[in-house]
Structures are given as structure tokens and as C-alpha cells.
Swiss-Prot record:
Domain of life: Viruses
Principal localisation: virion
Keywords tagged on the record: Late protein, Viral tail protein, Virion
Described purpose of this protein according to its UniProt entry: Forms the simplified baseplate, together with the p132 collar protein ring and the cone (DTP-pb9 and BHP-pb3).
Assigned GO CC terms: virus tail
Protein name: Baseplate tube protein p140
Length: 298
């Protein structure tokens, strides 16, 4: 019998002494690599074809997780780890970045034969999800400074995912008025960081790993796709003109995203049915973008 390693894998995140077990995975991807220093020691008398090469560092690892939303709402922790401010089940993207360094955690990818890869010094770089005609999936991008293969791992998990949430139809509102003919709504939240280059003399003859990073900026955006319709002649919103300082609420039965003041640019796609896409970002004077999860957080 053959086993798919990906199908049998588990993801466990260690943070603040607790273990978060994500088993409602739709997909994941991870890769590791090393940096090489190589030079040819050529002189006018000797032209060797064999390079002098050493492995001197680990490249930062990129990990992407596609996670189903579940009844325990532990998926919302990725927004905490990204640096959002939490008040109950509400999360706010701060106007000014509160942290110089991103929140760090460690992560295991555990296979069915108990072999696992341990990623250290991890931070969340992106969190994306879409509300459309399918079950919502959270796409999480993670950067890690160090990886290693280990034979032991956390066997007990403090928090695990619950049942996968069923489909719920999305809707978009502006000034309490629904916008018709919605096709899909995609949200993207990013934390852009850079690794600190802190090598010293004690790292000579060692494989260097990244340990610390610093936050450059955080941002939020959304893309809304509609069929191009007009409710009334001279409609002031359902047109192709850009909008600014417009409040928007994107929601379904389980989650809502609020842009208190948004700038909207519109793109018309010509096909059998005209479609218009709204590119949404918060304005500079907007209150914090808010994400609300409806339900009991475990």
C-alpha cells in the first residue's frame, strides 16, 4: 500500500507554550535550501576546473498552508500572529505598526511515520481568503529562518481544529445598502518583513540561520467581482468611476470584513457578460480595517 505523505501529514504550531493542531488542511507546500559560497582558485600558472565550495547558510524557508475554516475558529490566530489587535472575536489592522519585530513561533510538519521537519523562527507573511461559491479556505504564507529534521515532536495538542464550516453565500454592503450581482470577494492581508543580517565571528565555520526579522509594513486589500448591472438610471455607485472614502462591509454567515473608508478603482472585463472588478484599499485617514468572526472561539 502506498501512502501520500501530504495526505497523511499534520501541522502543529508552537506558540506561547501551546500547541495548535491544524488537520483540516486542503493543501500545503514547503521547500528548504542552502546557500553556497563557491570560487575558482585560478592563477596565471594554474587554472583548475574544480571549485572550492562550502555551504555557509540556510536560505529562509517559505511555507504555504491552505486551511479550511472550522467551528473552533482557531484559524483566526494567524491574524494575531500577523500583528492584528484583538478584542474578543474582532481583529483590527493597526494604523501604525506596533511591533518592530514580527511575532515568532515554531512549526512541525509531521508525517504518518512520525518523521517530521521542524521549522523555527517563523512569522506569518500573508493571509488570504475568498468568499465565493465554495467553502472558504484560508491561504497562509509563512517564512522560517531555520529548519531541521527531528525524531521527536509535540504529541499532545492544546487546541485542535473542529468540523469544517459549510458554505455560506457572501454579500457586500456600502452605507447599509447591498451591492447586487456579486460573483466573489477576495481579501489579502500582508506583513512585509526583512531578515536581520546579524552574522558575527562566532558564526565562522558554521551554517548560519536567520534568527530575527523586522517589520517594514502591514497592509490590507480586497478584490470584488460583480456582473456589471445598473439598478437605476444615473446610479451613483454602480458605474465605472473610481470611489474614495466609501465604507464597505464584506460578509457571510461566519466572518465579516469592514473597510471604514476605502478607495475603490474599477476594471471592466468584456466577455459574454460584462464583469467589473473593484480593487479596494483603505484610505490614509480610515479607521482600522476590522475582521469579525461569528461563533465561539476555542
Amino acid at each position: 500500500m502506498f501512502y501520500s505523505l501530504m495526505r497523511e501529514s499534520k501541522i502543529v504550531i508552537e506558540y506561547d507554550g501551546r500547541g495548535y493542531h491544524f488537520d483540516a488542511l486542503s493543501n500545503y507546500d514547503a521547500s528548504t535550501s542552502f546557500q553556497e559560497f563557491k570560487t575558482l582558485r585560478r592563477t596565471i600558472h594554474n587554472r583548475t576546473n574544480y571549485a572550492d565550495s562550502i555551504i555557509n547558510a540556510q536560505d529562509p524557508s517559505s511555507i504555504s498552508l491552505a486551511i479550511n475554516f472550522s467551528t473552533t475558529l482557531i484559524e483566526s490566530n494567524f491574524f494575531d500572529w500577523m500583528g492584528f489587535t484583538r478584542e474578543g472575536n474582532s481583529l483590527f489592522l493597526p494604523r501604525n505598526t506596533p511591533n518592530i519585530e514580527p511575532i515568532m513561533f515554531n512549526m512541525y510538519i509531521i508525517n504518518h511515520n512520525n518523521s517530521c521537519i521542524y521549522f523555527e523562527n517563523c512569522y506569518v507573511s500573508t493571509v488570504d481568503f475568498s468568499l465565493d461559491k465554495s467553502i472558504p479556505i484560508l491561504n497562509v504564507g509563512i517564512e522560517s529562518g531555520k529548519f531541521s529534521e527531528v525524531s521527536t515532536f509535540r504529541d499532545g495538542y492544546t487546541i485542535t481544529q473542529g468540523e469544517v464550516l459549510p458554505y455560506s453565500a457572501p454579500a457586500v454592503y456600502t452605507n447599509s445598502s447591498p451591492l447586487p450581482a456579486l460573483i466573489s470577494a477576495s481579501m489579502s492581508f500582508q506583513q512585509q518583513c526583512s531578515w536581520r543580517e546579524d552574522r558575527n565571528i562566532f558564526d565562522i565555520n558554521k551554517i548560519y540561520t536567520n534568527k530575527r526579522a523586522y517589520v517594514n509594513e502591514m497592509n490590507a486589500s480586497a478584490t470584488l467581482a460583480f456582473y456589471y448591472v445598473k439598478r437605476l438610471v444615473g446610479d451613483k455607485f454602480l458605474n465605472l468611476d473610481p470611489e474614495t472614502r466609501t465604507p464597505l462591509i464584506i460578509k457571510n454567515k461566519y466572518v465579516s470584513i469592514t473597510f471604514p473608508l476605502a478607495r475603490i478603482s474599477k476594471r471592466l472585463n468584456f466577455s459574454d457578460l460584462y464583469q467589473v472588478e473593484y480593487d479596494v484599499i483603505p484610505t490614509a485617514d480610515s479607521d482600522p480595517v476590522e475582521i469579525n468572526f461569528f461563533g465561539e472561539r476555542k
